Swiss-Prot record:
Catalyzes the oxidation of formate to carbon dioxide, with coenzyme F420 as the electron acceptor. Residues 285-306, 337-367 form the 4Fe-4S ferredoxin-type domain. The keyword Repeat applies. This is F420-dependent formate dehydrogenase subunit beta. It comes from Methanothermobacter thermautotrophicus (Methanobacterium thermoformicicum).
Amino acid sequence: MVEVNDMYYAFSKNEEIAEKGEYGGAVTSLLKFLLEEGMVDAVLAVKKGSDLYDAVPTLITEPEKVIESAGSLHCGTLNIAKVITRYLNGAKDIKIAVTTKPCDAMTIVEVAKRGKIDLDNVIMVGVNCGGTLPPVKTRAMIEEVYEMDPDDVVKEEIAKGKLIIETSDAEKGISVDEVEEMGYGRRTNCRRCEKNIPRMADLALGNWGVIGPLAGKATFVEVTSEKGADLLEKAVSAGVIEIEDPIPKGIEIREKIDQAMVNLAKKWQKNDFNEETGAEILMNLDRYMDELNKCIKCYSCREACPICYCEECSLETKTPEWIEKGKIPPSPLFHLERMLHMVDSCTNCGQCEELCPAEIPLAKIWHEINCRVQETFGYKTGFETGQEPPLTHP
């Protein structure tokens, strides 16, 4: 019997999926099984668009099409939670399975706390994430640093501390630290992220810790909820996937990799954040005013933020008029208002910074303040569905 906190090596019994899906195709097989058994109405996943650097969210209702979403897209920088709230009515009238990076899963949990997603209708199949790559800069990096043609790349991955780029006839790996010191590599928000294994999802899957005969042929699965346990047990009973107990050394290696990534994140936090550990929250906002004064009030940050969902935004209300119309840069109240609305639930997904045309380091600002909020209130963003965000009123 599969139970919460169990760990396994898992691989698909379907040869086509095992070959096309990564590390034995367990993720793809689980998603296909959910649709075939009618446990969900649709699967929300990401598939390759025009090329490797273009990740497109897709809603799949036909089991045979799930395989189109197989494989990783490290240049897929979207936050899938926004799709659920904006286009699927928060899964309030549809049952879905969704593949989630840790920041996706954390955001889904935070938005659910605010009553905008029905978690009873969502199964989160979480995948490990050591960071995503900005598409445009990654193409430039591949050409300038790796001396490869970006259009010839068939795969990219982070393994053993290296960013590895593969074409059909060549492979080259360079230290993650080295490429990031050059200004390339992972997105800046990903560098600071300590959440690599999505234990806030229903299942946490990845290749870390798979050693021995199944190395490269199976996925490491950690069961993180009752829903996840039920799904895995049914899939195994149906003969869709096969599971084996993990090699103890593999469990140890997985934890070491995770801890190494956490240590690297803390190094980047120290590099990016205010060194005054006891600094007041608002002091952090004040010291970024020069950056915030670049704002052209385009509202891209609000539109991109998966935590922003108000039907009537207080930044645009006429009565009272909190923000003076036509003034650029806007009053500091513009950013203070946004901060009060979302910063306690900020998951450092980086959407705001990625879309800002003024190149304001918004993700860094909100992430730093969110860390202060967590320290001050003892809050753990993205976990514990019963714990309300400290700055949010029901």
